[in-house]
């Protein structure tokens, strides 16, 4: 990416206006680095949305803890829906993870992104296959909360959220903000740690490895979304 404007800090986040070169186009991006936690992430994405009069969508990149069995460190995870690990109003008839008055989970409203996502995954498949240690790409429910999922509570978390593949401390908060603003959202995370590793599994991979991998997928998706948007605009013009 190339600098569009100087970076600046607002609240709990640093904002980096950038251009992403896609063919002959320079795609405007606002890269945001928030601090850790649900409130910090929600504050950052709300601020970011306020800077754009035409936001195509939000992509959350970063690291995550692998939750589902069979996931390994280094795997790339694509969110299909998002909920909270530590929201519990079940005593009042709500589902585990559901905030009262809000949906059980957030689907990201990104159904229209499926073609762009498939193109992005296909474009990066040769990179994945030729890697010294190929990783898997998995899709499913992503969890987020203010508490870590560890060996002490991983069994309960897996039972409560059977389809969940990962947990972190930001994704669902971003999904909720995007839901409120009716902006498409998707989480793209790379597994740095395992919440409940098996005896023969590596359970940690350096952030210097996993963060760039997540970013690569996120930027490829952004490029595909821009290309798709330009083609749709051309069709409308015709």
Where are the model-predicted features located?
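A C-terminal functional module that forms or caps the active site or interfaces directly
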Residues: 145-200
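Alpha-helix C-terminal capping segments
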Residues: 47-52, 70-71, 175-184
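Structural motif
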Residues: 56-59
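N-terminal short beta-loop-beta anion/metal-coordinating cradle
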Residues: 1-50
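Mid-sequence, gly/pro-rich, charge-dense loop/helix-turn segments that line enzyme active sites
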Residues: 67-162
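Active-site-proximal beta-strand elements of phosphoester/diester hydrolases
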Residues: 29-36, 139-144, 188
């Amino acid at each position: 990416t190339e600098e569009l404007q100087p970076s600046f800090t607002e609240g709990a986040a640093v904002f980096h206006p950038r251009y992403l070169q896609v063919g002959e186009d320079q795609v405007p991006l606002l890269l945001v680095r928030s601090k850790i936690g649900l409130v910090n992430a929600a504050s950052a994405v709300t601020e970011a949305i306020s800077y754009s009069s035409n936001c195509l969508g939000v992509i959350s990149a970063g690291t995550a803890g692998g939750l589902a069995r069979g996931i390994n460190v280094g795997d790339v995870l694509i969110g299909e829906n998002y909920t909270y690990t530590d929201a519990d109003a079940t005593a009042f008839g709500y589902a585990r993870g559901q905030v009262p008055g809000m949906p059980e989970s957030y689907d990201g409203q990104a159904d229209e992104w499926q073609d762009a996502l498939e193109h992005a995954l296909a474009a990066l498949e040769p990179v994945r296959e030729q890697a010294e240690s190929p990783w898997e790409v998995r899709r499913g429910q992503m969890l987020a909360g203010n508490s870590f999922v560890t060996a002490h509570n991983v069994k309960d978390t897996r039972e409560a959220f059977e389809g969940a593949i990962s947990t972190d401390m930001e994704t669902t908060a971003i999904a909720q903000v995007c839901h409120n603003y009716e902006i498409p959202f998707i989480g793209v995370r790379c597994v740095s740690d395992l919440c409940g590793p098996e005896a023969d599994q590596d359970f940690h991979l350096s952030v210097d490895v996993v963060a760039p991998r997540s970013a690569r997928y996120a930027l490829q998706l952004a490029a595909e979304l821009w290309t798709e948007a330009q083609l749709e605009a051309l069709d409308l013009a015709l």
